Amino acid sequence: MNISQTDAEKLAAGCHGNPFSVLGLHEVAGKLSLRVFLPGAETVEALDPKTGRVIVTLNQTETPGLFEGTAARRKKRFAYHLRITQGAHQWQMDDPYRFGPVIGDIDEYLLGEGSHRRLWSVLGAHVITHEGVAGTHFAVWAPNAQRVSVVGEFNVWDGRRMMMRQRGATGVWEIFVPGIGEGEIYKYEIIAPDGSLLPQKADPVGFGAEHPPRTGSVVRKIDGYAWDDAQWMTRRADVQRIDQPVSIYEVHLGSWRRVPEDGNRPLSYVELADQLVAYVKDMGFTHMEVMPVSEFPFDGSWGYQPIGLFAPTIRHGTLDEFRALVAACHRENIGVILDWVPGHFPEDAHGLGRFDGTALYEHADRKEGFHPDWNTLVYNYGRAEVANYLAANALYWLQEHHVDGLRVDAVASMLYRDYSRKDGEWIPNRDGGRENYEAISFLQKVNTESYGEVPGIMTIAEESTAFPGVSAPVDAGGLGFGFKWNMGWMNDTLQYMQQDPIHRKYHHHEMTFGLHYAFSENFILPLSHDEVVHGKGSLLDKMPGQGDDKFANLRAYYGFMWGHPGKKLLFMGCEFAQGVEWNHDSSLDWHLLDHPQHRGMQNLVRDLNALYRENAALHGLDCAAQGFEWIDENNAEASVLAWLRHGPDGGAPMLVVSNFTPVERSHYRLGVPQAGRWVERLNTNADCYGGTGLGNLGGVQSADIAAAGRPFSIDVVLPPLTTLFFQLDDG
């Protein structure tokens, strides 16, 4: 036997860390020797792949499954197929150990440095042609493993058969498996540093996954999709500027609409591309924000505990079918924002936790590496390879899937080491403080690389604290996000709206306080899924009163929101006043649209979107103080608020007035900066919205009567629980 007993024993035990050094073709004493390890085989022959003739018959060694033979007549390395006999069965296969490495020197250098921005082009499973043979290249990062194998039906899930090659000091293992391709299910089998066999792992850079609860990765081609959205991609940078309208429809794909006649299943990506896109277009939203689609094991996490960061969830279809949904949005000039979750990951055995038997992606110390709120693991942002893995994942969605923006989940939990931790449960930073410097650097890296590599996109932070500079540029010391959710505005205004109108005068500041900081960040006003779950009820539930009063309150609130500075976000179902809180296992209650009040609410949101989109006064200076001017800020007794919105072009301003009491206020005088007819552009009390129709008969003429420090004023009717929009008729 031309192999050491130690090597043979390691092969048989499946713990050889360098199988390519002993398997395949090797020169021994000036001759080419061929070795294969095929447990269960009885005879093995090497054939000429062109002629089918036997090149060499391999002999069984003392080690079961290990065969070797010498090609006495061959002087140069040669291609071959293996013919294997086992009982009555005979088959041919190519030998993975006859192929050279796939990863090149530049990729190897970038991997070793932890700076490969297109990490997904190297790691994962790629269908390729290598050395003239079609197959799939597998590569995975597991630097501390003793051995890594790819396993699947193609090798009867036997980790001894396809042990991988380690690439220098990169910690990456690779192997080219000839003859397998799209749709193949696989996992990685890893032996930890202590010699223990770990649970089989899904591919951290897998592009497809099995239907949960199955946990395998699936080979998917990521190249060659025929995009047809060039027109959108060309103009996207202009559409997504800060001075453009951004009105976002937040959607959970699994519960937007279901198919009751087919087991109440959720819609597929293909069906969503037809039905959802048409609906978002009809409603006038500029963007659709999709709750996380990266593959996740537990439905009840809503996608916020992902494991397959590079795989669109198979619950709705394949990777290319997800791309078709994005393309359908773009054809209708709708931007697509993905919820992205780099803050934590679940402890499921097939996931990233202790991936190679060590704390690889997470911190080893649970004070840093475990999240008490969600019982999940926290990424080690200070490790270059981990930060690169996540930053590359952001680029992957933006580049490979043409996604237009990323909304980063739970940013506050990343920024602070003591987030949801008691004294003694967290480790201070190097300066003794609570800020997580590594997470801050990571977020800056993500934003710098995302905006730098993919111009025209947007990034959005869900950040619930007063951390400074979230949407400030990185070179100015900020985190570099394009926008930040205004959680303070949401909490304050919802608190106000839940008050009985008779008590609102004591809470007036909750509606005005947000303007003290409204321009400190580039804000989005969010009424998200978080406000309609966990016993909070629906938005309609939160409104005081009974019947029509509830709807009137909510209509007035929506008017206030669309008239307020900041981009807009509304969770699905809220646009037609879903009556109960959201349930991820059920469809929205679309039957409610048979009722006039719900249909009226839908009409209102559609018209608010149109008014917002079409008037620069309502969006052009959303994030700039010069776009806002109070007219009536302090009338707490009447619970009335009035303000002007200005556009960047000096056009006609928009006057917004909200009356948050159930009292009609006739002859209410409002100061205005210019004389003329002020047209009533929208009245949330209109008949078509489910209101009484009381209003100002299309508009009012100003009078030369000074009011509120303005030389002119208008005398208006403020219907109960109503928001009005007036605009100067400039001819």
Swiss-Prot record:
Pathway: Glycan biosynthesis; glycogen biosynthesis. Monomer. PANTHER family: 1,4-ALPHA-GLUCAN-BRANCHING ENZYME. InterPro entries: A-amylase/branching_C (IPR006048), Branching_enzy (IPR037439), GlgB (IPR006407), GlgB_N (IPR054169), GlgB_N_E_set_prok (IPR044143), Glyco_hydro_13_cat_dom (IPR006047), Glyco_hydro_13_N (IPR004193), Glyco_hydro_b (IPR013780). Its EC number is 2.4.1.18. This is 1,4-alpha-glucan branching enzyme GlgB. NCBIfam families: branching_enzym (TIGR01515), PRK05402.1 (NF003811), PRK12313.1 (NF008967). It comes from the Bacteria. It catalyses: Transfers a segment of a (1->4)-alpha-D-glucan chain to a primary hydroxy group in a similar glucan chain. It is an enzyme of class 2 (transferase). One of its GO terms (biological process) is glycogen biosynthetic process. Gene3D superfamilies: Glycosidases, Golgi alpha-mannosidase II, Immunoglobulins. One of its GO terms (cellular component) is cytosol. It comes from Roseobacter denitrificans (strain ATCC 33942 / OCh 114). The active site is at residues 409, 462. HAMAP family: GlgB. Pfam families: Alpha-amylase (PF00128), Alpha-amylase_C (PF02806), CBM_48 (PF02922), GlgB_N (PF22019). Catalyzes the formation of the alpha-1,6-glucosidic linkages in glycogen by scission of a 1,4-alpha-linked oligosaccharide from growing alpha-1,4-glucan chains and the subsequent attachment of the oligosaccharide to the alpha-1,6 position. Keywords: Carbohydrate metabolism, Glycogen biosynthesis, Glycogen metabolism, Glycosyltransferase, Transferase. Belongs to the glycosyl hydrolase 13 family. GlgB subfamily. GO terms for molecular function: 1,4-alpha-glucan branching enzyme activity; cation binding; hydrolase activity, hydrolyzing O-glycosyl compounds.
